[in-house]
Design a protein with these regions (language model features):
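C-terminal segment of classical bacterial N-terminal signal peptides
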Residues: 12-18
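Acidic low-complexity segments
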Residues: 18, 23, 31, 192-199, ...
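Active-site rim recognition segments
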Residues: 340, 344-456
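Short intrinsically disordered coil segments
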Residues: 180-184, 230-239, 366-369
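Intrinsically disordered, low-complexity N-terminal segments that are enriched in acidic
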Residues: 31-226
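Sec-dependent N-terminal signal peptides
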Residues: 4-12
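Short loop/turn segments at secondary-structure transitions that flank enzyme active sites
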Residues: 171-173, 220-226, 291, 358-360, ...
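Active-site neighborhood of thiol-dependent amide/isopeptide-bond enzymes
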Residues: 269-351, 355-357, 372-375, 379-387
Length: 456
C-alpha cells in the first residue's frame, strides 16, 4: 500500500511540474525526446515547402516541389498518420546539392577556395618551424583567450530546481597546450581525461523569475600542423596489428562508426599503401558529397550511411564516413571536434585524425576538401593540405563520440554524439533548444611560441 501511495505522490508532483504548459524543450523521456526532435526538424508541410521554394528561387522551381521530393533532393519524413513533412532546412539546402537550381556546377569540396583560404594554408606550409624529427611542421601558433557562456531563461518548469551545466573546454593534444581556466561564475569540476568530451561542470539553483547565467574564461595555445606527403611516404611503416592501440582505433563503434569495407575497397582498388588508400578515400568523399545543413544528429540512425544514401553531408557527417572507411581498411582513425575560429567564421566544426605507423597522428579535415579544381590550380601541397594538415583556428574539445559526460548526465543529451554547445539539465529533465543559449566569445588572440615534440 505504501508503494501505491508513494507512486501516486510522485505522479502528482510530476503533474504539477510537467503539466499542459510544459515547454516542448523540456525532455524527460528519451524516446519522446527523439520524436519531438524529429517533429521539430521535419516541420514543413509540402505546401509550406513549396511556398519557401518560391520565396528562395521563384515560381518555376516551386512548381517542381514533388519532383524534388521524388528525387530525394528535398528530405521528407512520413508521420504515423500518413502526412509527408519536409525537413526545415531542405529548401535552403536545395541550391547546395542541385546545380540545376543554383546555376553553378558543383565540382568538389575546396574547389572554390579563395585567396584568404590559400594564405592560411601557405602560412603553415612555409613556416620554418618543425619538430625535432623535422617532419611535423608546427606553426604558426596563437594563444587564445575566450569566454564560454550559457544562459538559461526562467521558466516555471524550472522553479525550485537546480540547473546542471556542462560546457566544452579545449583538450590537451599535440596541437593544443597551456590550457588554463582564468575565472568562472560558479565553482566547477573539470572532466580531466575521464571522458572523450572535455568539459567544465557547474550547477546553480534556479531563482524564481530570473535567468541563470553560467560562464567561464579560459586560455590556451593552439598550433597549426602539417606533414608533407613526401615525409609520410618515406617514413610510413607496416602497422603492428597486435597492439592494443591498433585495435582501439580500428574497432567499429556502431551505430556511427560502421564497417564500410565493401565501399572502401571499391574506392582503393589494388592500392596497399595506407597513406595512398587514405588519399583515395579523401578525394572520393570530397568529390562526391557536397555540404548541406544537417538534421539533429540524435535523429540519424547511422551517420555514414546517411551520407551514402542522401548524397551530401555536413562536416561531422562526412568525417564519420571517412573514419568508418579508414577503420574498415585497417587504418586507425579518430574523431576530433569543437569549434572553428577562422576570421569572420566562428562556428561548430568536426574533423578527424588518421594514424600512420612511423609518423603518428595526422589531422584530416574532410569538410575542407582539396583546394582548387586540380593540384595545378595552386600547387600540390596547397591542394591537398587538409588531407594531412590543419590550421591554427581551432578549439578542439572532443576526441571521440558518444561518450559519457563527467559528472554523468541523468537524462538524454541534447547532443548525443558530439559536444559543442554544452548541456543543461535539472533533476527532472533535459533542457533542449531553445530552452537555453550558449556562445563562445573570443576575447583576445596573440601570436605564440610553438611547443616542440620529439614524437607523439
Amino acid at each position: 500500500m505504501k508503494h501505491i501511495v508513494l507512486a501516486a505522490a510522485l505522479s502528482l508532483v510530476a503533474t504539477q511540474y510537467l503539466g499542459a504548459t510544459t515547454p516542448s524543450w523540456f525532455e524527460t523521456d528519451s524516446a519522446k525526446a527523439i520524436s519531438k526532435r524529429l517533429d521539430r526538424d521535419f516541420s514543413l508541410t509540402v505546401e509550406q515547402a513549396r511556398h519557401r521554394l518560391s520565396e528562395l528561387y521563384g515560381a518555376s522551381v516551386a512548381a517542381r516541389t514533388e519532383e524534388f521530393i521524388a528525387q530525394g533532393l528535398l528530405e521528407t519524413r512520413t508521420t504515423a498518420d500518413g502526412n509527408v513533412m519536409v525537413f526545415r532546412k531542405a529548401p535552403s539546402n536545395l541550391k547546395l546539392i542541385c546545380p540545376e537550381v543554383s546555376g553553378v556546377e558543383w565540382i568538389s569540396r575546396g574547389a572554390d577556395a579563395d585567396s584568404s583560404d590559400v594564405a592560411i594554408v601557405r602560412a603553415v606550409i612555409e613556416s620554418p618551424l618543425a619538430s625535432e624529427d623535422e617532419y611535423y611542421h608546427r606553426g604558426p601558433a596563437q594563444t587564445i583567450t575566450f569566454r564560454f557562456v550559457v544562459d538559461v531563461p526562467y521558466n516555471e518548469v524550472l522553479d525550485g530546481d537546480t540547473l546542471r551545466v556542462w560546457m566544452p573546454v579545449p583538450v590537451e593534444t599535440e596541437r593544443q597546450y597551456d590550457i588554463s581556466i582564468l575565472s568562472s561564475s560558479h565553482p566547477y569540476v573539470l572532466s580531466d581525461g575521464r571522458s572523450v568530451h572535455n568539459t567544465i561542470y557547474m550547477q546553480a539553483p534556479v531563482t524564481t523569475g530570473e535567468s541563470t547565467h553560467f560562464e567561464y574564461t579560459g586560455c590556451y595555445t593552439v598550433t597549426s600542423l602539417y606533414v608533407s606527403e613526401e615525409d609520410i611516404l618515406s617514413r610510413i611503416r607496416p602497422y603492428d596489428t597486435t597492439a592494443p592501440f591498433y585495435t582501439d582505433y580500428t574497432t567499429m563503434q556502431a551505430p556511427h562508426i560502421v564497417d564500410l569495407g565493401v565501399e572502401a575497397r571499391d574506392i582503393i582498388g589494388d592500392e596497399t599503401n595506407p597513406y595512398l588508400q587514405h588519399k583515395l578515400v579523401y578525394k572520393y568523399i570530397a568529390d562526391r558529397y557536397p555540404w548541406a545543413g544537417a538534421r539533429e544528429y540524435s535523429t540519424i540512425p547511422c551517420m555514414p550511411r546517411y551520407v551514402l544514401d542522401r548524397g551530401y553531408g555536413d562536416c561531422g557527417q562526412v568525417s564519420m564516413l571517412y573514419i568508418s572507411m579508414m577503420r574498415s581498411l585497417g587504418i586507425p582513425a579518430q574523431w576530433e571536434s569543437g569549434w572553428m575560429l577562422h576570421p569572420g567564421d566562428l562556428n561548430y566544426h568536426d574533423w578527424a585524425e588518421v594514424y600512420f605507423e612511423g609518423i603518428g597522428w595526422v589531422p584530416v579535415d574532410m569538410s575542407f576538401g582539396n583546394y582548387g579544381v586540380t593540384p595545378e590550380t595552386y600547387d600540390k601541397d596547397t591542394h591537398g593540405f587538409y588531407s594531412h594538415g590543419i590550421d591554427m583556428y581551432r578549439f578542439a574539445s572532443n576526441r571521440g563520440i558518444c561518450g559519457t559526460l563527467y559528472p554523468a548526465k541523468k537524462y538524454i543529451r541534447s547532443e548525443t554524439i558530439d559536444f559543442q554547445a554544452g548541456e543543461v539539465e535539472t533533476s527532472r529533465g533535459n533542457l533542449f533548444y531553445p530552452g537555453w543559449r550558449s556562445s563562445l566569445q573570443i576575447i583576445k588572440t596573440e601570436p605564440a611560441a610553438v611547443a616542440q615534440y620529439e614524437d607523439q
